[in-house]
Design a protein with these regions (language model features):
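Small-residue-rich beta-alpha loop regions that form the catalytic core of phosphotransfer
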Residues: 2-90
């Protein structure tokens, strides 16, 4: 199993993401990923999570709106060797 970091905004998509989270985690697990899920708590949180946690993972997926994606990319741009990024829009 390879490590994957999932940074997600629990309020994205009118709060629908938490309802879909189990299905998302199930699909990653079936694909042999060991998932660590990180729910953002406010502005700038995805930047910090991507920057501080990103180096520990070979893949990082963010789930949320354009703000979550923007913050995640901002955090990854601060890394010398960032993980591969995936995006699930909500």
């Amino acid at each position: 199993m390879e490590p994957l970091l999932l940074i997600y905004n629990p309020t994205a998509g009118k709060g629908q993401l938490p309802d879909e989270l189990a299905a998302v985690l199930d699909e990653f697990t079936k694909a042999n990923w060991l998932v660590t899920a990180y729910p953002t708590q406010g502005k700038g949180d995805a930047v910090r999570a991507a920057r501080e946690l990103g180096p520990r993972f070979s893949r990082l997926v963010c789930a949320g709106g354009d703000g979550t994606l923007s913050e995640t990319v901002t955090g990854l741009m601060q890394l010398e060797d960032p993980p591969i990024l995936g995006y699930i829009p909500f």
